[in-house]
């Protein structure tokens, strides 16, 4: 099934430049309302520095496009009741396609980040053909969750994929020839043969970081290093309340951080953090002790009793995260390290506590200490994050850092 967009906002963008002052101020207002949940016109004018008249014109325009809705009037203050404006969940939608090393996800979210529909499929390793088959079957299922009128408000497809997915073949347990097919795979071209919508591609953990920034981050950290524990560990960076992707879109790739170590001959060498603090390492450890490891990939809520092997892995992960945190803090003065992953909440909390302990015992001379907190999106962060890409591109002040990737 081919989905074609009839979204009025997409048509509007084709007719006028989105780089003008009006579009910039629209993004500022949408971002502000997203951050605060809702806000009246007077508060928006105060926080943006725009005139009351300019705010009124923009708010009225966004309301006419069904992107904003009026909330109940706030009474009890001097003067007339104020009317807060909030994002309209039905105002726009994004589809996310997450390409994982062990699974595929297809997710539909609305403008405020609610998951309207989601599909998941496990795999031993990702192949080009299995992805296209999954997408073609799944896209029609997602569309069924919306009325024909709302389906016109789907703004695009965000794709989250591991950086250089064809590398680390031994660690991924996949044939090199199969993974090499991804080198020449053009996501935009192939997906557009199935879905006639704009396609945006980014790193999987950058996508997860964007989900935390847009729909989580309850402590309102302005600058934080985001860490996602998946099949391979990875991360993202937020600076000045903005997703920082770097020139080539791979900022925060902590999985590739080399950790000094001694080899069997006592010589100094290094090992990437991927090989210490990733889920596939736990899988190897459990298999070595005779455990069935299917639960790691089939459930993100509860793993049952995995005994001392899990405890050893948690300690190993925390050791790596504390090292990564110190290295990152030496380069940029982050407020916090935010840890999430495709793992049960109780396991994540143990990792956070263990990381805090190891950091507290580390040598911080010349480096400021930071908060260490759990992420708030969970195992679906990558999926929600890539579905959020079309929304960010259209409505967020972060759009410039994403659109060129």
What are the roles of these predicted feature ranges?
Residues 1-71, 77-120, 126-152, 262-405:
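ATP-binding/phosphotransfer module of carbohydrate and carboxylate kinases, centering on a glycine-rich
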Residues 35-36, 215, 230:
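Short helix-capping/turn signature of helix-turn-helix
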Residues 70-94, 199-224:
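Conserved phosphate-binding catalytic cores of ATP/NTP-utilizing and phosphoryl-transfer enzymes
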Residues 94-98, 154-158, 224-228, 234-236:
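Short glycine-aspartate micro-motif
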Residues 110-112, 167, 239-240, 261:
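Short acidic-glycine loop/turn motifs at beta-strand connectors
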Residues 115, 119-223, 350-360:
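Glycine-rich phosphate-binding loop and adjoining helix at the ATP-binding site
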Residues 164-167, 207-209, 234-235, 244, ...:
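Short, active-site-adjacent cap segments at secondary-structure transitions
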Residues 220-276:
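Glycine-rich phosphate-binding loop of actin/hexokinase-like ATP-binding domains
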């Amino acid at each position: 099934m081919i989905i074609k967009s009839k979204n009025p906002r997409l048509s509007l963008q084709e007719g006028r430049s989105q780089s003008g002052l009006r579009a910039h101020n629209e993004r500022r207002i949408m971002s502000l309302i997203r951050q605060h949940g809702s806000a009246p016109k007077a508060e928006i004018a105060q926080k943006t520095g725009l005139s009351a008249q300019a705010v009124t014109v923009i708010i009225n325009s966004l309301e006419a496009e069904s992107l904003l809705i009026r909330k109940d009037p706030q009474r009890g203050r001097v003067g007339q009741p104020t009317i807060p404006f909030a994002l309209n969940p039905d105002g726009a939608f994004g589809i996310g396609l997450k390409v994982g090393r062990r699974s595929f996800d297809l997710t539909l979210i609305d403008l405020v980040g609610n998951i309207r529909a989601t599909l998941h499929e496990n795999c031993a390793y990702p192949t080009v053909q299995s992805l296209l088959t999954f997408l073609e079957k799944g896209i029609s299922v997602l569309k069924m969750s919306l009325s024909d009128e709302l389906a016109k408000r789907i703004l695009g497809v965000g794709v989250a994929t591991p950086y250089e997915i064809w590398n680390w073949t031994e660690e991924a347990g996949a044939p090199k020839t199969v993974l090499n097919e991804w080198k020449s795979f053009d996501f935009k071209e192939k997906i557009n043969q199935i879905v006639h919508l704009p396609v945006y591609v980014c790193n999987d953990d950058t996508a997860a970081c964007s989900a935390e920034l847009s729909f989580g981050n309850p402590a309102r950290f302005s600058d934080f290093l985001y860490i996602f524990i998946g099949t391979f560990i990875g991360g993202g960076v937020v600076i000045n309340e903005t997703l920082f992707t770097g020139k080539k879109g791979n900022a925060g790739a902590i999985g590739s951080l080399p950790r000094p170590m001694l080899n069997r001959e006592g010589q100094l060498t290094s090992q990437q953090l991927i090989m210490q603090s990733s889920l596939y390492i736990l899988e190897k450890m459990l298999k070595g002790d005779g455990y069935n490891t299917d639960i790691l990939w089939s459930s993100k809520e509860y793993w049952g009793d995995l005994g001392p092997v899990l405890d050893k892995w948690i300690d190993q992960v925390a050791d790596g995260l504390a090292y990564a945190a110190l290295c990152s803090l030496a380069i940029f003065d982050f407020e916090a390290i935010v840890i999430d992953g495709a793992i049960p909440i109780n396991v994540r909390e143990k990792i956070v506590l263990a990381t805090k302990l190891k950091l507290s015992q580390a040598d911080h001379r010349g480096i400021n200490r930071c908060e260490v907190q759990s992420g708030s999106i969970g195992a679906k962060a990558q999926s929600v994050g890539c579905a959020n890409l079309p929304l960010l591109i259209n409505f967020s002040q972060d759009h410039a850092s994403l659109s060129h990737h």
